Amino acid sequence: MIQVTSEQWLYWLHLYFWPLLRVLALISTAPILSERAIPKRVKLGLGIMITLVIAPSLPANDTPLFSIAALWLAMQQILIGIALGFTMQFAFAAVRTAGEFIGLQMGLSFATFVDPGSHLNMPVLARIMDMLAMLLFLTFNGHLWLISLLVDTFHTLPIGSNPVNSNAFMALARAGGLIFLNGLMLALPVITLLLTLNLALGLLNRMAPQLSIFVIGFPLTLTVGIMLMAALMPLIAPFCEHLFSEIFNLLADIVSEMPINNNP
């Protein structure tokens, strides 16, 4: 019969507990993995499996579990995981923003519904673009790249009481501008053409006031918008590939800035 001593239990707890906090924090905020449609047991099981794979290669931390240092260490691991997952959400937020811009120009701003995944009121076109971005993210193996980047953080920023550089979180805050910038770049061709169409309808209304511009304008704008979206579809995949690559490079820069360099 195999007997396990209390020292062995304590060693395993120190070895697996701290990495598990960082992994679960990432899963709770990362794209796709944080969807409410995924059961919590599946998320917990995935986090435990990832931890069982990566933890044996990490040195055990001997911080007492019931201490102020352990509380600070737990907050640090959770903060690192949340920062990684939250940054990756910027790419999907940019695609959703593009869908909101296009839907607004198409006259679909009122076509909203409660998203079952996030329980937020979201435009239909934004949700379609978001689902397309999720499929492309899986196609490009983005989830594997994200887990690989998480593993790298354990070597770049080992589990310990060392503080995290605040410059990394400043870079994370500045990266929020990528949402509006990339969303506008993706939607700009459709917005420009639909704006031109609306200007033409406005001139037509001035030249022929007897025409009911509301009866003509909405079906025409909606039809042209659907045609433009069909033309835009082949360009979404390379755009998302470039966007995901940009976000992963940003994540790598943020992770590299997290350790505090004590060298003069």
Swiss-Prot record:
It comes from the Bacteria. GO terms for cellular component: bacterial-type flagellum basal body; plasma membrane. Pfam families: Bac_export_1 (PF01311). It is a multi-pass membrane protein. GO terms for biological process: bacterial-type flagellum assembly; protein targeting. Its main location: membrane. It is found in: Cell inner membrane; Bacterial flagellum basal body. InterPro entries: FliR, T3SS_IM_R. Keywords: Bacterial flagellum, Cell inner membrane, Cell membrane, Membrane, Transmembrane, Transmembrane helix. The chain crosses the membrane at residues 45-65, 66-86, 131-151, 175-195, 213-233. NCBIfam families: fliR. Belongs to the FliR/MopE/SpaR family. PANTHER family: FLAGELLAR BIOSYNTHETIC PROTEIN FLIR (PTHR30065:SF8). This is Flagellar biosynthetic protein FliR. The gene is fliR.
